[in-house]
Design a protein with these regions (language model features):
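Structural motif at the C-terminus of the N-lobe alphaC helix and the adjacent alphaC-beta4 loop
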Residues: 42-54, 105
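Helix-rich C-terminal or lid/interface subdomains of diverse kinases
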Residues: 15, 188-253
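Internal "kinase-insert"/substrate-recognition segments embedded within catalytic cores
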Residues: 48, 89-116
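Short beta-strand micro-motifs within the conserved protein kinase catalytic domain, predominantly
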Residues: 57-68
């Protein structure tokens, strides 16, 4: 099938995202890992087939101009991030809605996804820019965390939640989904707000999430150094200083 690549929506170092009719085309750079692309498509398919969540339907994995592409259903609407920017006076209302949607996701289970503790352990062991003492403390803390099997999106941020014209919602970008601990997913969302220079919103989010979920904030905070280390392993230069603030601690009390 031929796709029209004139309407570029997003550009990233490793991929561009296009809209072509009712399709979203995620086109990766040449020589991008075939394993990673197929794994992303597999994750999306597993969530689609094993839950009742509204997510883009996976349509095909193909090659376009010698580059790998994932083609999915296009979801019409505004993201929660866009709505917050359009109507700042309603930001608190949208943030509460955002948390409700996240808790809906976390109430589901997809048993064939990778386990979050296995993924995080591998990433921390691969991280070269922390001391052995910090690595040991992080791995000990990770090992002590409860083994849960909740569906964790892994990149649950307002730009990945689309509110459709009929006010139904859909969740996009499932590349990082795993099964694991609710608090880990919340810690990841919190850290995303921090990295986006939204510290006040990060704290507001954390309080709302704790209140709605019934989880003690301290339990979520215990995951933050772990999640920061995992993100540090990705090697984004612009994030390193912030992430080290959370990782470079000895006493994780």
């Amino acid at each position: 099938m031929n796709y029209n690549l004139e309407n570029k929506m997003i550009s990233r170092p490793t991929k561009d995202v296009y809209k072509d009719g009712d399709n979203t085309i995620k086109l990766f750079v040449e020589n991008y890992s075939k394993c990673d692309i197929l794994n992303e498509a597999l994750i999306q398919a597993r969530v689609e087939e094993n839950t009742d969540l509204n997510i883009p339907l996976l349509r095909e994995v193909t090659k376009i101009n010698n580059k790998w592409a994932i083609v999915s259903e296009y979801i019409e609407g505004d993201t929660i991030e866009e709505l917050m920017n359009k109507y700042p006076e309603k930001a608190g209302e949208y943030l509460n809605w955002f948390v409700d949607i996240q808790l809906t996701v976390l109430s589901r289970e997809v048993p064939f996804l990778n386990r979050i503790k296995d993924k995080y352990s591998q990433r921390i062991n691969q991280l070269t820019e922390i001391s052995d003492a910090i690595r040991y403390e992080l791995l000990q803390r990770l090992d002590s965390m409860p083994n849960h099997c909740k569906l964790c999106h892994g990149d649950f941020v307002p730009s990945n939640v689309v509110i459709e014209p009929d006010t139904n919602w859909a969740i996009i970008d499932w590349a990082h989904a795993t099964q694991g601990n609710t608090s880990a997913d919340a810690a990841n969302t919190y850290l995303n707000f921090i990295i986006g220079n939204q510290e006040a919103r990060a704290e507001e989010y954390l309080n709302i999430f704790a209140q709605k979920s019934g989880i003690d904030i301290h339990l979520i905070q215990k995951w933050i150094p772990i999640v920061a280390a995992v993100r540090l392993q990705k090697g984004k230069l612009e994030e390193k200083e912030i992430l080290h603030r959370f990782v470079d601690v000895v006493d994780f009390s």
